[in-house]
Each structure stands twice: as C-alpha cells, then as structure tokens.
Amino acid sequence: MMVFDGFINWVRNFFRLRQDISLGIYGCTNVGKTTLANRIAKDWTGEEIGKASRIPHETRTVQKKEKILIQSNGKKLRINILDMPGLATKIDYRKFLKFGINKKNARIRAKEATQGIVEAIKWLNHVDTVLAVMDATKDPLTQVNITLLGNLEAKGIPVILVANKIDMKSAKPNNIKEAFPQYPFVEVSALSGRNIDQLYDAITKHARKAG
C-alpha cells in the first residue's frame, strides 16, 4: 500500500511539473521588475531576460523566459516568467526629455509605453500568479497599486507582494505590508539578491495554475 501511495504521489508531482505556471511580474515603472525577472532567470538558468534601466518604461513589451524549474523547501515548480511593461495612470513624453532623448523619440517612447500598458492589462487573462512589485522607498498607496490589486482580486489571481529595494537606506518595506496585509509578502533586494530565497519559498507555496 505504501508503495502504491508513493507511486501516486510521483505521478501527481510529474503532472504538476508538466503544467507550467505563468508568473506575471507587475508594478509601476522603475520598481525593479526587470531586475527581479533577471535575478530569478539567472539564478535558475544562468541567463537574463531583458535590460534594466533607470529610464521609465524601458520595458515596453512583455518579455518572456519559459520553462524555468525552481526548487525550494523540497518543492519543485516550473514557471514561465512574464516581465510586464511598467504600469502608469499617465504617460507624458516630456518625462523622457530629462534623459537626453529628443522630442521625436520621446513621443515614440510614450506611444509605445501606452501600448505596453494595454498589453500588460490584456495579459491578466493569461497569467496564473502575479508578483506585485513595489518600491520599498515609496508610498505604496498609489492608484496603480490599488487598481492592480483590485483587478487581480476580482479575477481570482493569486498575488505575492514583493517589496523591492530594501538595500536602500530609505526603504520602509513594512509600509507595504501594513497597506496590504491580506496578501503573502516578501521583502527583497533584486539587485543584491538579499532575501531572494524567501521569494522562491513564497512562489512554490502560493503560485498555482489557473482553473
């Protein structure tokens, strides 16, 4: 009987691994989404996903890395990482001028950034679990964060809050935890890798396949 039970567990684990989890990384601009995506991808595959930049909306299309096998606390999970364009309530092309981008290219970037936000919102229908990344040095109670979490809750999509940039002296990750106490919470530095193992624990514990 024990042998049979062991076989059943093996079969369950086998098919669980065959069902990849689509893990969407969402948040405002410049909260470290791409840095976090690169950290996860490099830790488990040795390869990064995209280019991180201090310029807002550097990621303007969904960037993907598929079939990443992560392991934590004796659990295995195969994920497809989806690094989403940064969300914003308003995009002003003049914001890009401060980074030495000429007016023509700034307007193009603003248009692409707007399209990227629309694409990211559409992808909410295709992700299984979301890492909602927030900058631990800033006020978490923004319209973007509140709207994002409200949409995820309405769609029944599991969420893990990630307070990023805890390596900064001004970081106050507890502000995020206290603002949204109903969600699983991890504080990390995607740049240095601090507490990243705690994030992998949370992903293997809370991520699930839609349906």
Label each region the model flagged:
Residues 1-99:
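Conserved G1/Walker A P-loop phosphate-binding module
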Residues 58, 86-88, 137-139, 165-169, ...:
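Conserved nucleotide-binding/hydrolysis micro-motifs of P-loop NTPases
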Residues 1-26, 138-142, 146, 156-158, ...:
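Conserved P-loop NTPase architecture
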